[in-house]
Regions:
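Short, small-residue-biased leader/transition segments that mark boundaries at the very start
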Residues: 2-5
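Transmembrane alpha-helical segments of multi-pass membrane transport proteins and ion-pumping complexes
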Residues: 9-21, 25, 59, 63, ...
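Intrinsically disordered, low-complexity non-transmembrane regions of multi-pass membrane transporters
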Residues: 19-50, 78, 105, 111, ...
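Hydrophobic alpha-helical segments embedded in the membrane of multi-pass proteins
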Residues: 41-44, 84, 88, 122-133, ...
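Generic transmembrane alpha-helix signature in multi-pass membrane proteins
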Residues: 48-54, 60-68, 132-138, 144
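Transmembrane helical segments that form the transport core of multi-pass membrane transport proteins
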Residues: 57-124, 139, 156
């Protein structure tokens, strides 16, 4: 695939901005309370779609790493089907991890970057879910769920006004993204060296 994952936050930002602008135009003269209540229900659907997209992207990456390990150890070949136990193990792990450790990240995304109202939450989630589905099913491209939804939230917030976005929080997120890859590589190398020393491989 020719998809560049670093571009996807900007894709999410632009699409969420456009979707939110369309929502504002359509519901401009409607009762704000009724509109908010309607989007609160709609957000239940968009949140479920987003959760499914999260599993389709992030769980599949973990499955791929485990399957690659099995191939390298001679327990499987590239032509084999993905073992069912890997699918269930990764699905369970990502579900438990999201439920147990995702609260702080959800708070940062839902309240830290902007104050999300139901309409903006729906816009960000629906756009992000669409991007995740298209990249996973149509382009076979692994992308970051967090990067896509962050771009969507920024786009929905910018549509209101640029000053409504807490850009300092966004900069902190960018720093975290930049540090993740080298930190993960360094830790993986360290673990490998320890295993090599202990096992004598």
């Amino acid at each position: 695939s020719d998809v560049c994952s670093s571009d996807l936050p900007f894709v999410g930002l632009i699409l969420a901005f456009l979707v939110m602008r369309l929502i504002v135009v359509i519901f401009r003269n409607k009762n704000p309370q009724k509109v908010g209540g309607g989007f609160r229900h709609a957000q239940s659907v968009s949140a479920c779609a987003m959760a499914m997209g999260h599993g389709m992207q992030d769980a599949q990456k973990t499955m791929g790493v485990i399957f690659l390990l099995l191939i390298s150890m001679g327990y499987a070949s590239a032509s084999d089907e993905m073992p069912v136990w890997i699918v269930f193990a990764c699905a369970g792990a990502i579900s438990i991890g999201t439920a147990v450790g995702g609260k702080r990240i959800m708070k940062t995304l839902g309240r830290g970057i902007i104050d999300l109202d139901p309409a903006r939450g729906f816009s960000a989630e629906s756009v992000s879910a669409t991007v995740l589905y298209v990249t996973a099913l149509g382009l076979d491209a692994p992308v970051s769920t967090t990067q896509v939804i962050t771009g969507g939230i920024l786009g929905a917030g910018v549509e209101k006004r640029v000053s409504s976005v807490r850009w300092g929080v966004g900069v902190n997120i960018l720093w975290a993204w930049g540090l993740t890859l080298p930190a993960a590589a360094a830790i993986a190398a360290l673990v490998y060296l320890i295993i090599k020393l202990v096992s004598g491989l």
